[in-house]
A protein has these predicted regions:
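Alpha-helical transmembrane segments and their helix-helix packing motifs
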Residues: 1-248
């Protein structure tokens, strides 16, 4: 679902030259991914970092928390790769004479070239906003409230250009696929000034330059900056909520 949000937001933003405006347009559309997850009961790795609240509250063990995160992480990866493949073969990247395919390459090149420090810090900032969106959605009492609770924090992380490991499971692989198409490659070199060396650097090994630090940052942002502080700030309310949900 996050991959679908990434695909549709890229389609909307790829033809906009102004970076700020392009991010704003993408930010308006991208939140649909998390909305679908929340409303259909899906699992998202970054949101599940909030399980740490149950760990600190002794409702689940660290082993159960880590097991959940590992299973969900790789499930999200499989789902994203399926969407990547469908998007590529659907011809979606042919939009604007192949410019969307070139845009996918440009985005992927930028992401695999990220420094470890930037990946971690950007990942922290991203998942602070994602986890806040999840908590706000849980607090909202109706669908409209949940929609707006999700919309603004997720829009903020997209506009801010922060790194989200699950979103990158769409952006990087689809860019790698696009890099195998000579039409998209030529367009990327023409429109964005990318070199053949940069495009050839789109490999699984180089993708780890992004996934490892960004995943670490997302975990820190969700657990250390949101989950644990929120547990201690709202400890009594959290315990009461758990007690109430047990009786329902």
């Amino acid at each position: 679902f996050i991959a679908l949000g990434g695909a549709t937001s890229s389609t909307a933003a790829h033809g906009i030259d102004n970076v700020g405006l392009a991010r704003f347009v993408a930010g308006i559309i991208f939140p649909v991914g998390l909305m679908i997850i929340v409303f259909v009961g899906g699992e998202l790795f970054t949101g599940n970092c909030l399980i740490v609240m149950d760990v600190v509250g002794k409702k689940v063990t660290w082993f159960e928390c880590v097991r959940n995160l590992i299973v969900v992480y790789f499930s999200n990866l499989i789902g994203a790769l399926i969407i990547d493949t469908l998007i590529y073969f659907s011809g979606n990247l042919d939009y604007s004479g192949g410019l969307l395919g070139a845009y996918a390459i440009k985005v992927a090149v930028g992401k695999v070239g990220i420094s470890p420090l930037k990946g971690i810090t950007s990942g922290i900032l991203c998942n602070i906003l994602v986890c806040i969106a999840i908590l706000m959605a849980v607090a909202a009492t109706d669908i409209v409230g949940k929609v707006w609770a999700i919309f603004f924090p997720i829009m903020a992380f997209v506009v801010g250009g922060f790194e989200h490991c699950v979103a990158n499971m769409f952006y990087i692989p689809v860019g790698m696929m696009a890099a195998q198409n000579p039409v998209y490659v030529a367009k990327a070199q023409e429109a964005y000034g990318l070199t053949a060396e940069q495009i050839q650097g789109l490999t699984v090994l180089h993708s780890l330059n992004n996934f490892i630090p960004v995943t670490i940052g997302n975990i820190l942002g969700g657990m250390v900056f949101v989950g644990i502080p929120c547990y201690f700030i709202y400890k009594k309310k959290w315990q009461k909520w758990h007690a109430d949900t047990k009786t329902v």
